[in-house]
């Protein structure tokens, strides 16, 4: 297992290099001139050219790329074109709000999603199954931005129960986490149901029932453990989705996280911040997939990696 983990970690190097190249080319293909945006619409050509020189945008593209890669290897992603602060500091100040929002959303989504999926599988083709799957389909179909605005209108504007802006207290996490985790809970419910339906029809489940084991114990001990392997895969993918896909939710709730920082950076063509954030999201996805593979072996000892 240790050798497998080491090989996967070494595989990060070429993957992140390819991502770095693609991201660099992508951001430089975006329409718009960062120097003009930073200098202002009323700036003349001389001022804009001066800003371009200060930002290093007057240099050849290959020179900019080499400067970016050589510094990134050392952990230096440069300065933000807008704030003139180190990119690492910009990301660090926004990382924890996004991480806590993601964890909060994931916790409730997994608990409710798996519970709904198990109930739907145990009472298959009956009203609990139909009700759970109807709610799940609605959660998948409803756009996150529309759900966010609906929750704001009901619980903040009309009832005045919850705040909408900021991340200062636990109340600020309720509406964004509900919005962000709704689709994940729906996906988890459908995926858990499908996995449990397959497991419940296995021979060892019938054997456990024939031995007089209670249905609750059969489901929790024998069913849950064997149904968890595909569910863990989905959990890992959804966690990565939440980390990188919170852009819309953070924009709706004006959340001080990485998603809003990325949107603001794209609007201002802040190349260093865009490049660093996308690279960070890629690294998160790779590491999450590695953790999922390790959890496979923990859940099912029959799985071994070489």
UniProtKB/Swiss-Prot annotation:
Membrane topology (Periplasmic): 30-102, 156-168, 250-277
Name of encoding gene: gsiC
GO cellular component, one term: plasma membrane
Record-linked SUPFAM superfamilies: MetI-like
Keywords: Cell inner membrane, Cell membrane, Membrane, Transmembrane, Transmembrane helix, Transport
Gene Ontology BP, a term: transmembrane transport
The protein, known as: Glutathione transport system permease protein GsiC
Record bears the keyword Lyase: no
A Pfam family that the UniProt record links to this protein: BPD_transp_1
Domain ABC transmembrane type-1 span(s) in chain numbering: 95-292
Side of membrane Cytoplasmic, spans: 1-8, 124-134, 190-228, 299-306
Biological function: Part of the ABC transporter complex GsiABCD involved in glutathione import. Probably responsible for the translocation of the substrate across the membrane.
Family per record: Belongs to the binding-protein-dependent transport system permease family.
PROSITE patterns referenced in this protein's UniProt entry, alphabetically: ABC_TM1
